[in-house]
Amino acid sequence: MVAHTRADSAPKPTDPALAGARILVVEARYYDAIADELLAGALAAIEAADARATVVTVPGALEIPAAAAILLDTGAYDAVVALGCVIRGETGHYDIVAGESARALMDLSVQRRVPLGNGILTVETEAQALARARVAEMNKGGGAAEAALGVLALKRMADGARPR
């Protein structure tokens, strides 16, 4: 017989491991209407977990990883939520921005052991972006925050900081 244990790291609004957590939200506001929806969803998820958010704004998706790294160096944050949108255009710039921002965020998360939710949308059209960003529809901002919170809960459990 094989023993099996499953750790459920999905954040719950009353999870004491998340209370007071300091979440850094780095948003690219290149597309304001999309950014507004992503941010609303992320902030609602963070508030539901009884965590605290600090929001900083950068010009575009490529600036998000550097801004997150700079602010993580302060030691003031437990997790990061990255929010932005890259819409395919007529040149190859989309591929560079989408790929490099995702790679840099993954590197940041793994190398620094920081929980990170990637809410940078990569889409073909603005309509696709709005559908994914809207809180009432796909709520990808909320999903990114929940991902960061879920990994933070898991990290705290692994570090022994979770109340029993």
Curated annotation (Swiss-Prot):
It catalyses: (2S)-2-hydroxy-3-oxobutyl phosphate + 5-amino-6-(D-ribitylamino)uracil = 6,7-dimethyl-8-(1-D-ribityl)lumazine + phosphate + 2 H2O + H(+). GO terms for cellular component: cytosol; riboflavin synthase complex. It comes from the Bacteria. (2S)-2-hydroxy-3-oxobutyl phosphate binds at residues 90-91, 132. Coiled coil: none annotated. It is an enzyme of class 2 (transferase). The active site is at residue 93. 5-amino-6-(D-ribitylamino)uracil binds at residues 30, 61-63, 85-87, 118. GO terms for biological process: riboflavin biosynthetic process. Keywords: Riboflavin biosynthesis, Transferase. InterPro entries: LS, LS/RS, LS/RS_sf. Disulfide bonds: none annotated. Pathway: Cofactor biosynthesis; riboflavin biosynthesis; riboflavin from 2-hydroxy-3-oxobutyl phosphate and 5-amino-6-(D-ribitylamino)uracil: step 1/2. Its EC number is 2.5.1.78. Transmembrane segments: none annotated. One of its GO terms (molecular function) is 6,7-dimethyl-8-ribityllumazine synthase activity. HAMAP family: Lumazine_synth. Catalyzes the formation of 6,7-dimethyl-8-ribityllumazine by condensation of 5-amino-6-(D-ribitylamino)uracil with 3,4-dihydroxy-2-butanone 4-phosphate. This is the penultimate step in the biosynthesis of riboflavin. Belongs to the DMRL synthase family. This is 6,7-dimethyl-8-ribityllumazine synthase.
